[in-house]
Amino acid sequence: MLPFSSKLLITNVFHYINDNIFSVLLGRFYTSQDVGYYTQANKWTNMGFSLISNMINGVSQPVLVETSSDAMRQKNIFRKMLRFTAFISFPAMFGLALIANEFIVIAVTAKWQACVPIMQILCIWGAFVPITYMYSNLLISKGKSNLFMWNTIAQSLVQLTMLLCTISQGILVMAVIYT
């Protein structure tokens, strides 16, 4: 149990670092106004995909663990959950990207309109986040915390390298690379 759990702990530490490194780099190389625009866009995007992800994860993990002994059944259930997740996530997040300008003006006033392009990029990325969480739950339910950990570490290192290479290109390019 300890080897499995320790790998999940390491994975969660990398997730935490990876989730916060972008803001740290923005604060170091850009103005506080630019960081504020990114933070505002990220806040609204996170609310959107977190609502969907939390709803799906609350159901998927127990179901996938319960069906882990029957690979064919788990595969069929996973496919159904994946379709359902895409059915909810894509219209919600792409819709939020489409109405981002109006949403920002209504929610936090027109002074934050500069965050709209960043929010649109993050919303497109956010449509896929619940699906990646589904695959993570599948790996964990199959007891493959080692694969999950190394995948997360590799992804984090690639993202950090790409961010460092694109710092001079601007926040929009960094947001595309980071997502």
Write out the residue ranges for each language-model feature.
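Residues that define the loop-to-transmembrane-helix transition and helix capping
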Residues: 33-36, 79, 113-116, 145-146, ...
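Alpha-helical transmembrane segments of multi-pass membrane transport and lipid-handling proteins
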Residues: 78-130, 159-168
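Helix-terminus/linker motif at the lipid-water interface of multi-pass membrane proteins
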Residues: 16-47, 62-66, 101-111
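Alpha-helical transmembrane segments of polytopic membrane transporters and translocases
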Residues: 7, 22-24, 34-53, 83-87, ...
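Membrane-interface helix-loop junctions in multi-pass transport and translocation proteins
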Residues: 146, 153-179
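Helix-loop junctions and terminal segments of transmembrane helices
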Residues: 41, 45-89, 136-141
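Interhelical loop/hinge segments that connect adjacent transmembrane helices in multipass membrane
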Residues: 1-20, 33, 59-76
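Residue-level recognition of pore/gate-forming positions within transmembrane alpha-helices
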Residues: 16, 43-46, 93, 102, ...
